Amino acid sequence: MVKKQSRLTAKWLRKIGVKEVLIPGLLLAGVLGWTGWQKLGPDIYRNKQAFPDSGIVRVITDGDTFELQNGVRVRTVGVNAPGRGEEKAGEAVKRLSDLVKDKKVWLEYDRYQDDKYGRVLAWVWINCEFTPKFLPSDYMRLSFNRSRPGLTENPEGCKKGKLVQEEMMKAGLAKLETYKVRGELKYEGRLR
């Protein structure tokens, strides 16, 4: 029988996999009366409030980051767009806005699902025919730095849809972001 957590603590949040950057905010929310923490764990990545399958994009932060209507900040995994003050940063923001602003997006998770800034990392799909059937987030993982062969086809349910990262790269407004010491991401090979 699983013991029910009676008090919100930093130790418990770490145990269920919450990133350090999120812990102070969650503790403060708990002190102020938020009880949603009781629905967290044992695997934070399965929590659909923190890691939604889809959403409507309301705010474009920069060329590779946006915010959904529920406040979740999403960073497009696998690519890096010019940041504020860099050449083509404005163009990247405009293109991302044209692709996703006020539209429904579907989020496909990979072996890395969040970053140190508290953003969700996801492959972002648009214009899907119906709810896509994604492979599990750990599909690529064979070990820490070894992966299965990457995916090249669109997921079932999104055969006519578009991968936002791919559209940004085609426009010359994002570059492939790889990590030599980590394993390959699902669509990394497709973007090369």
Predicted regions and their residues:
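Small beta-barrel nucleic-acid-binding modules, primarily SNase/OB-fold domains
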Residues: 2-192
